[in-house]
Design a protein with these regions (language model features):
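ABC ATPase nucleotide-binding domains
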Residues: 183-203
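A generic "structured core" feature
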Residues: 130, 134-136, 140
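Conserved catalytic-core motifs of eukaryotic protein kinase domains, centered on the activation segment
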Residues: 72-74, 145, 161-163
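C-terminal boundary and immediately downstream tail of ABC-type ATPase nucleotide-binding domains
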Residues: 174-182
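Flexible, glycine/small-residue-enriched loop-and-beta-strand segment within the central core
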Residues: 5-22, 27-125, 154
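Short, charge-rich, low-complexity interaction segments located
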Residues: 154-163, 167-168
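Acidic, glycine-centered active-site loop in nucleotide-sugar glycosyltransferases
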Residues: 147, 152-155
Length: 205
């Protein structure tokens, strides 16, 4: 990622983005597939990822080989195979099962602002990852992740909070991710050098 980004999203030629919206200063890397999703300003998705029916906030850091909304199969039916809901692929006189796809879409994934999804992690349908949360490499996230919480493992479990709850609440109230590009540049040294408490005190959180 050693290129100059801009308000125009960057999508690698080998990536595929369909029926989705990409914010300003965003980047989609090699061989990644994004469909029916949205990517907030400044967020990036590294190589070989798959996002479907997922809303990603601003400043999200998505490492390589991440899967968001790994779709479910019908475990309650006599067969798991998709011929039951993709029937028109197999028979000219059969149709796809609209209700099944609507059920899948009703279990969208939400990824908050300033989040980090580690390499090879998977976020299952219907899960929400809160603002400021981090997901460890290889984790399988089956339940909602609280804001500013670090989770890891299979299934993912909380390891610790990034900050105490009061500090986390102050960051969410500050909502620095909504600052404009010029203000972010002015605060760059503070992001780099101040502690969380010092940053909040200076910037009114």
């Amino acid at each position: 990622m050693s290129r100059n980004l801009s308000e125009q999203p960057y999508v690698h030629p080998s990536a595929e983005v369909t029926q989705s919206t990409l914010g300003r200063w965003t980047e989609v890397s090699e061989r990644t597939r994004i469909s029916d999703s949205s990517l907030g300003d400044y967020s990036y998705v590294m190589q070989d990822c798959s996002l479907w029916c997922t809303t990603v906030g601003k400043f999200s850091n998505i490492a390589a080989s991440v899967r968001c909304n790994a779709t479910n199969h019908p475990t309650w039916r006599p067969t798991l195979h998709h011929f039951t809901y993709r029937a028109s692929d197999y028979w000219e006189d059969a149709s796809h099962e609209t209700e099944f796809f609507e059920w899948r879409r009703s279990n969208a994934v939400t990824i908050g602002h300033d989040t980090w999804l580690g390499h090879g992690s998977t976020v299952l349908p219907g899960v929400a990852v809160g603002d400021g949360a981090a997901v460890g490499s290889g984790a399988v996230v089956t339940k909602d992740v609280a804001p500013y919480t670090i989770v890891a493992g299979v299934p993912a479990k909380p390891l610790r909070e990034r900050f105490d709850r009061k500090t986390a609440d102050r960051f969410q109230a500050l909502a620095w991710w909504d600052w404009d590009h010029a203000r972010l540049r002015v605060a760059l040294d503070d992001f780099r050098n101040l502690s969380a408490e010092e940053f909040l005190e200076k910037h009114g959180g």
